[in-house]
Amino acid sequence: MEDVKLEFPSLPQCKEDAEEWTYPMRREMQEILPGLFLGPYSSAMKSKLPILQKHGITHIICIRQNIEANFIKPNFQQLFRYLVLDIADNPVENIIRFFPMTKEFIDGSLQMGGKVLVHGNAGISRSAAFVIAYIMETFGMKYRDAFAYVQERRFCINPNAGFVHQLQEYEAIYLAKLTIQMMSPLQIERSLSVHSGTTGSLKRTHEEEDDFGTMQVATAQNG
């Protein structure tokens, strides 16, 4: 594949006056990027409406599994736009398939001047994984760097081992996707031609080896 230079925006730096982390802060939401918040369900409960409005929240991503639907609910559907994802906090759960739609949802909100809260139950594993994935793809970061960036703002994050593995795999996936999107039709055609040419060369090499072997056998028989 031809080299394509990908360009990413600069990552916002940590605020110098950031609060020192304390245990009760895990029950609150934190602003990870300008306009992007991460927190537990307790930060999106009915009693927290004044706080959500104070921070200008307009969109909410609610991550839960089916058995949690009775108590983790989109409480303000008339006030905020919701994206509800049914995902279990299970290492074998496939979360990569949801990354494109969550990125589109967050990007759409931020582009129109809105603010997004991403929450699961505790705001530690599932929701943290999605915020990390968003930062990776938006700013061209590796998993470990995106994790560290989010943890500076919400210290208690701890995606399960299966989610970590998928996030590490996602780096190659999003880079390949963005590279193809940046390539012109001519570049794509050339890349395919190079690939086909390599395959053809290998095929010709094997055919030539077979022909040479046949010649050796014929020579031996005639001798």
UniProtKB/Swiss-Prot annotation:
Modified residues (Phosphoserine): S184, S193, S201
Motif (Interaction with FBXW7): 76-78
GO terms, biological process: negative regulation of SCF-dependent proteasomal ubiquitin-dependent catabolic process; regulation of ERK1 and ERK2 cascade
Source organism superkingdom: Eukaryota
Intracellular or extracellular location(s): Nucleus; Cytoplasm, Cytosol
Chief place where the protein resides: nucleus
UniProt cross-references to InterPro entries, sorted A to Z: Dual-sp_phosphatase_cat-dom, Prot-tyrosine_phosphatase-like, STYX-Interacting_Phosphatase, Tyr_Pase_dom, TYR_PHOSPHATASE_DUAL_dom
Xref: SUPFAM superfamilies: (Phosphotyrosine protein) phosphatases II
Ranges for domain Tyrosine-protein phosphatase: 28-176
UniProt-annotated stretches for the region Disordered: 197-223
Gene3D superfamilies the UniProt entry points to: Protein tyrosine phosphatase superfamily
Listed Pfam families: DSPc (PF00782)
Entry's Gene Ontology molecular function annotations: F-box domain binding
Keywords annotated in UniProt: Cytoplasm, Nucleus, Phosphoprotein
One GO cellular component, as annotated: nucleoplasm
Subunit structure and binding partners: Interacts with MAPK1; independently of MAPK1 phosphorylation status. Interacts with CARHSP1/Crhsp-24. Interacts (via FQQ motif) with FBXW7 (via F-box domain); the interaction is direct and prevents FBXW7 interaction with SKP1, a component of the SCF(FBXW7) complex.
Function of the protein: Catalytically inactive phosphatase. Acts as a nuclear anchor for MAPK1/MAPK3 (ERK1/ERK2). Modulates cell-fate decisions and cell migration by spatiotemporal regulation of MAPK1/MAPK3 (ERK1/ERK2). By binding to the F-box of FBXW7, prevents the assembly of FBXW7 into the SCF E3 ubiquitin-protein ligase complex, and thereby inhibits degradation of its substrates. Plays a role in spermatogenesis.
PANTHER family in the record: SERINE/THREONINE/TYROSINE-INTERACTING PROTEIN, SERINE_THREONINE_TYROSINE-INTERACTING PROTEIN
Family membership: Belongs to the protein-tyrosine phosphatase family. Non-receptor class subfamily.
Protein name (database record): Serine/threonine/tyrosine-interacting protein
